[in-house]
């Protein structure tokens, strides 16, 4: 057995979200259409550069109110797929409640190793801290959220002093099973690198509140990752809690953030307020 009683084929299947959700491709197509519509309807500052690499850029959608808080959203895709444009639809929920939304893009594997990706997210948040005031935002109220790989990257950003709180959605917090399955063909993690970049093994000594959310219809390994991380977070005396979303799978989870009245939107607002 390779990991927790699973052989390689079983471990591959345990992290294959697209195979587990038959409607995944249709959902992704729907996200793209809704994201394009939001970008047409909401004037945003797009492709703001936080670094010199091609994918070191972010989009910033501003709420109507001045000095608004900002949530920086980090997209998923197992660190090797997708871009910020495909997740613009998520901005609708927070914007409706007067929260700015920054969508962060980053260099993907195999062009980047994990530590570079983690570093890029930290750099993007630092850019927001420095430049939000130029757009009328409040740099003292920066929050971070992310889905799947973005949930992992959200967790790695929680130790930054400028981050006031976070929402980690369907994330990966222990990278050892990732190192051992098909995802590592592009990630190229070795054992030490997986350990260094596993949030479960490197909890901050001080942080703002973190909500760790997962869908009860997700793959069991994805559920376990969130449950284990939330427990470790709380056991370390850090503020936050676990938030299971009943009946949600890995993809439908995000509807609870896109919806202005969704469970994840409400959780984010509670962190901010």
Question: How should these model regions be labeled?
Answer:
Residues 1-273:
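Alpha/beta-hydrolase superfamily serine-hydrolase fold, recognizing
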């Amino acid at each position: 057995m390779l990991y927790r009683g699973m052989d390689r084929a079983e471990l591959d299947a345990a992290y294959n979200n697209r195979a587990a959700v038959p409607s995944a491709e249709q959902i992704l197509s729907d996200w793209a259409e809704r994201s394009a519509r939001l970008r047409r309807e909401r004037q945003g500052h797009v492709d703001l550069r936080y670094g010199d690499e091609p994918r070191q850029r972010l989009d910033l959608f501003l709420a109507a109110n001045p000095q608004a808080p900002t949530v920086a959203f980090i997209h998923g895709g197992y660190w090797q797929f997708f871009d910020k444009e495909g997740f613009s639809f998520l901005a609708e929920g927070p914007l409706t409640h007067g929260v700015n939304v920054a969508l962060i893009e980053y260099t993907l594997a195999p062009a980047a190793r994990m530590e570079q990706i983690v570093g890029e997210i930290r750099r993007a948040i630092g850019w927001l801290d420095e430049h939000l005031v130029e757009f009328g935002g409040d740099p003292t109220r920066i929050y971070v959220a992310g889905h799947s790989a973005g949930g992992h990257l959200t967790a790695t950003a929680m130790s930054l002093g400028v981050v006031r709180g976070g929402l980690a959605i369907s994330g990966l917090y222990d990278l050892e099973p990732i190192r051992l399955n098909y995802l590592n063909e592009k990630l190229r993690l070795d054992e030490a690198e997986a350990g260094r970049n596993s949030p479960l093994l490197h909890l901050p000594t001080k942080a703002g509140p973190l909500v760790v959310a997962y869908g009860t219809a997700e793959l069991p390994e994805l559920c376990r990752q969130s449950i284990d991380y939330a427990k470790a977070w709380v056991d370390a005396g850090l503020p936050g809690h676990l938030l299971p979303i009943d009946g949600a799978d890995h993809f439908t989870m995000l509807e609870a953030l896109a919806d202005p009245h969704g469970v994840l939107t409400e959780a984010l607002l509670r962190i901010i307020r």
